[in-house]
Regions:
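Hydrophobic positions on the alpha1 helix immediately C-terminal to the Walker A/P-loop
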Residues: 206, 210
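Aromatic- and Lys/Arg-enriched surface recognition patch
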Residues: 80-146
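Hydrophobic anchor at the beta1->P-loop junction of P-loop NTPases
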Residues: 195
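Compositionally biased, charged N-terminal/linker segments
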Residues: 1-55, 161-173
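Pre-Walker A adenine-sensing motif
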Residues: 171-192
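P-loop (Walker A) phosphate-binding loop of NTP-binding proteins
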Residues: 198-199
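Short, Lys/Arg- and Gly-enriched loop/turn segments at beta-strand edges
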Residues: 66-88
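Conserved glycine(s) of the Walker
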Residues: 202-203
Length: 211
């Protein structure tokens, strides 16, 4: 019996201009890039994280970018916010000894979702390694792993010293109308949509608007 705690890693699926997520899903695997370029310093850095992954751990396919408009909260107009699009979830079954390949079981019908502020751009991001970000990491993992749509606690991040520069002080943080259409589309796919979130994050408002 393995008593080790399972860990959660966020991994990229784009190498250059090519996106391999559908290929990985079809093949039941995920791969770290830099094939035939193992001397690359970035590969060597990622290999250290790769070697931390074990059977039972969870991989989240992600892409990271910035957005200025069409956000689900009010912010200062001139600032761009870091966004992590979480696109898939897989459970690790086996790690091959080639330094690149992990055999996984991809979760079917995973609903893509966007997470803001606390994000990672590396090919392998292990937020649990950031010991002073335990609270943010726990929120992120709960958000990413949920079968249901959870509203991120935007107020928490907008009032956090690291991200409060984005807060528009003269306006109360609220869900934007143009973002509601994204949830309406999700609702069409998931008839058992349940909204969760901390008090004051807009669950009741959102439910009324997409009804």
């Amino acid at each position: 019996m393995n008593s080790e705690q399972n860990n959660y890693f966020f991994v990229g699926t784009k190498f250059g201009d090519d996106d391999y997520l559908e290929y990985f899903r079809k093949e039941g695997k995920w791969e770290l890039g830099w094939h035939n370029n193992e001397e690359n310093k970035q590969y060597q850095k990622m290999l250290k994280l790769f070697n931390k992954i074990k059977p039972g751990d969870v991989l989240f396919a992600k892409s990271t970018y910035v957005k200025k408009n069409n956000l689900p909260f009010v912010k200062k107009d001139d600032l761009k916010v870091s966004v992590m699009n979480i696109r898939g979830m897989a459970t690790v079954k086996e790690i091959l000894d080639d330094g690149h390949t992990i055999i996984v079981d991809w979760k079917k019908e995973y609903i893509e979702r966007e997470w803001f502020f606390f994000t990672g751009q590396e090919t392998i991001w292990f937020p649990s390694d950031i010991t002073y970000r335990t609270k943010e990491t726990n929120q992120l993992i709960k958000f990413a792993a949920s079968d249901e749509i959870i509203i991120q606690d935007y107020d928490y991040f907008l009032n956090h010293p690291n991200w409060k520069k984005y807060k528009k002080l003269e306006s109360e943080t609220m869900l934007r109308n143009d973002f509601l259409f994204d949830y309406s589309g999700i609702l069409k796919k998931s008839k058992n949509l349940i909204l969760r979130g901390a008090p004051g994050t807009g669950k009741t408002y959102l439910a009324k608007e997409i009804a």
